[in-house]
Structure formats: structure tokens, C-alpha cells
Amino acid sequence: MENVLIIRYGEIMLKGDNKSFFEAKLTKHIRGAVKDLGDVKVYKMHSRVYIDVEDFNADEIIERVKKVFGVVCISPAVRFPVDFDVIKETALNQIKEEMAQRGVKTFKVESKRVDKKFPLKSPEMSREIGGYILENTEGLEVDVHNPEVRVYVEVRECSFVFTKKVYGFGGLPLGTNGKALLLLSGGIDSPVAGWLVAKRGVEIHGMHFHSYPFTSERAKEKVVDLAKILTTYCGRIKLYSVNLLAIQKEINEKCPEEEMTILSRRFMMKIAERVANKIGCDALVTGESIGQVASQTVKGLHVTNAAVELPVFRPLIAMDKVDIMDLARKIDTYETSILPFEDCCTVFLPKRPVTQPRLEKILRSEALLDVEGLIESAIGDMEVERISLDDE
Ligand SMILES: Nc1ncnc2c1ncn2[C@@H]1O[C@H](COP(=O)(O)OP(=O)(O)OP(=O)(O)O)[C@@H](O)[C@H]1O
């Protein structure tokens, strides 16, 4: 009898001829996530990935594998050659363990017969195993609708018995859908936006704008911390830091005060696009959401968008703030995002930012600036940091 983790994936199954490419990537990422935990054997077999584990105490492995995009759910299971008597006994033992640990009183057996040569059909298996459990326990009842514990039995090339399903985030394996550059502020939204795009298999890198020395070192470190949290899902991220201060000063001097935010945002987009093109990213990602702040009106988004040609992915565009916050908590970025450090956008915060900008007017203001020179100089001073899971 062996202890294994069964790792299931969802959407990859629909990939037709490309399925094996996606499976290979997923297996590689799962291996990468656990490689420093010792000699952990990870392998793919019959449209699932398995990990051999010493015992059921595989919490750390499960915690990490759960974060690998593409993983739908994980079950710690026992595997053994197909033998119905052993199946019944193992199911009984697992229920007894649940009774001892959690005091469960109701259960249901869910069986699956994949090997059609096995003589009992799935419902017959469930009935017999359920009957055997009832005969050999006291105070336990079957509840088919809302059981406290489900005992899963599978008859495939081997038998599997388990009681737990730990859910991952689904999505597609990282690196199966190209590369994008995330505009990563220290706020709540952009880390969530990057996470959502990465979940679709896109390798992401980050670009942060600061106004040092008006913004502090600690504010920059906060963004590095956020990028580190993202690497627990994405493995590694290159973080590009750009000082926007010279640009902001120039806008402040030459353009109408109320256009500061929208003009700065257009510079951010242009700089990000320039760097994205250099490093092979085919899209930008932002945490913008309609109506959330003054610059995120539909007109504001239009004017921001018009600064670049690359596609801009805004996965939060129609989400409410509370839902974004919930997701931030789920992916562990929230607590870091709410730390009170200043952002470059607050350095020259206009009293009444324009909320309904007209593109022609913004372009006229922009023409007062040496856009090209300012961009080149900001990129020239850019810093790059390679952040990876192994950094600690
Ligand atoms: N300093 C920055 N560095 C990098 N990107 C930024 C910066 N400030 C804003 N952005 C990008 O522009 C988007 C909109 O920023 P804005 O400040 O208008 O909204 P927000 O709701 O506060 O966003 P966030 O919560 O992500 O900071 C951000 O989600 C981010 O993608």
C-alpha cells in the first residue's frame, strides 16, 4: 500500500493535440514547487499527476502544489492493487480515522469504476462498501445529500481510496500563453490583476514607478514584497523600477494641474510598452477598474489606452472593490498591499483631477513636453531586480 497525492487538472484535458505540451509544463511546475523539500517523486500517469509521499502528513507539499496554476484539486490517497476486500477494509479504516479525529457521524461512499473489467458497477461498489462500513462501526449513518465525510473509491489500473479534496486555483500552467508586463503599484489591485493574468498561463514581469526620494525606500520594498508573494505562484519575476520624478516635475511645470494624473499614467504606459517590447512581452497588465478612481472613468481609460499600441489587459475592469479585496486576501497580497507607504501618484496629487479628459486636449498638453527625451532618460536609469521563489 502506498501513500500518494493525486493531482487533478481541468481545462488542460480539453487541449486536444496540445494536451501533452500542457501536461509536461504542469508536471515541470509541480516538480519545481516541491524540489527543495527533498527527494519528492512527481510523475504523470493516465491524465493525472501523482506525488509519492511518505505518509499522509504532506501538508507542505499540498500547500505548494495548490498554488501551481492548472491544478484543480489534490487528494492524499492510498493506492494498492485492485482487490475488493482490501478496498472495503481501507475505506473502513479511513472512516474510522475521520470518526476519531473529527467525530463525524454521517458519511457517503462515492465510487468510480474506470476499469470496466472490474465486475461491480460504481453504484454497486458504493452500496457494498457503505454496508460494510455500517456493519463495522457504531453511531454512523449514511447521508447521501450532505454527509460530513465522503469516502472516494476509484478502481483504475490500481485502487485508490481517499476522503479529502483540497482545491487549487485551476487555470493553465505558467508559460503556456506568452509573456506580459504588469504595472505593479503598491496598492491592492495590481497584484490581483497580475495574478489573474498569470493564472491563464501568462508569464508576468513587473514594472514599478516611484518618485524617489519623495517616495521612500520602504515604499519600494513593499512592491518587492508583493512581487515575492506573486512568485509563490509564478516562480520568478523580473521587477523593473523606474523613477518618474523628473517626468512629474516637468508635467507640474508645463501642463495644467488637473492633468497630472492622466499625463503621468500615459507616461507609465509608454515606458512600460517600450520595455515590454524589448523583453518580449506582448501585453501590458494593469489593475484598473471602471469608476474606481478619478482616472478610471471610461474617458480616462480611453485616454490612457491611447498612449500605447500593445494590448492592455485589465482583468479587474468590471469587478467591485470588495470582490477585488476578497481575492487579494485569498492570494495573500492584501496584508502587504494595505501597509501605509506612499505612492508616486500622491506626490503631485491634483486637487481636482480631470475625470472626463479629451484626448485632443491631453495630446496638446503632452506636446509641451519632451516626451521622447523624458522616456529615454527614465528608462536609462531603470533598475532591474530578479525575484524568485528560491530567494529567501
Ligand atoms: N506607481 C505605480 N507603479 C506601477 N504601476 C502603477 C503605479 N501606479 C498605478 N499603476 C498602475 O495603474 C493602475 C491604476 O492605478 P490607480 O492608482 O489609478 O488605481 P488603484 O486602484 O489605486 O490601483 P492599485 O490598487 O493597483 O494601486 C494600477 O492598478 C497599476 O496597474
UniProtKB/Swiss-Prot annotation:
Pathway: Cofactor biosynthesis; thiamine diphosphate biosynthesis. Keywords: ATP-binding, Cytoplasm, Nucleotide-binding, RNA-binding, Thiamine biosynthesis, Transferase, tRNA-binding. GO terms for molecular function: ATP binding; CCA tRNA nucleotidyltransferase activity; tRNA binding; tRNA-uracil-4 sulfurtransferase activity. ATP binds at residues 183-184, 208-209, 265, 287, 296. It catalyses: [ThiI sulfur-carrier protein]-S-sulfanyl-L-cysteine + a uridine in tRNA + 2 reduced [2Fe-2S]-[ferredoxin] + ATP + H(+) = [ThiI sulfur-carrier protein]-L-cysteine + a 4-thiouridine in tRNA + 2 oxidized [2Fe-2S]-[ferredoxin] + AMP + diphosphate; [ThiS sulfur-carrier protein]-C-terminal Gly-Gly-AMP + S-sulfanyl-L-cysteinyl-[cysteine desulfurase] + AH2 = [ThiS sulfur-carrier protein]-C-terminal-Gly-aminoethanethioate + L-cysteinyl-[cysteine desulfurase] + A + AMP + 2 H(+). It is an enzyme of class 2 (transferase). Pfam families: ThiI (PF02568), ThiI_fer (PF22025), THUMP (PF02926). Residues 59-166 form the THUMP domain. GO terms for cellular component: cytosol. Its main location: cytoplasm. Signal peptide: none annotated. Its EC number is 2.8.1.4. InterPro entries: Rossmann-like_a/b/a_fold, ThiI_AANH, ThiI_fer, ThiI_N, THUMP_dom, THUMP_ThiI, tRNA_STrfase, tRNA_sulfurtransferase_ThiI. SMART domains: THUMP. It is found in: Cytoplasm. GO terms for biological process: thiamine biosynthetic process; thiamine diphosphate biosynthetic process; thiazole biosynthetic process; tRNA 4-thiouridine biosynthesis. Gene3D superfamilies: 3.30.2130.30, HUPs. Belongs to the ThiI family. Catalyzes the ATP-dependent transfer of a sulfur to tRNA to produce 4-thiouridine in position 8 of tRNAs, which functions as a near-UV photosensor. Also catalyzes the transfer of sulfur to the sulfur carrier protein ThiS, forming ThiS-thiocarboxylate. This is a step in the synthesis of thiazole, in the thiamine biosynthesis pathway. The sulfur is donated as persulfide by IscS. This is Probable tRNA sulfurtransferase. It comes from Alkaliphilus metalliredigens (strain QYMF). The gene is thiI.
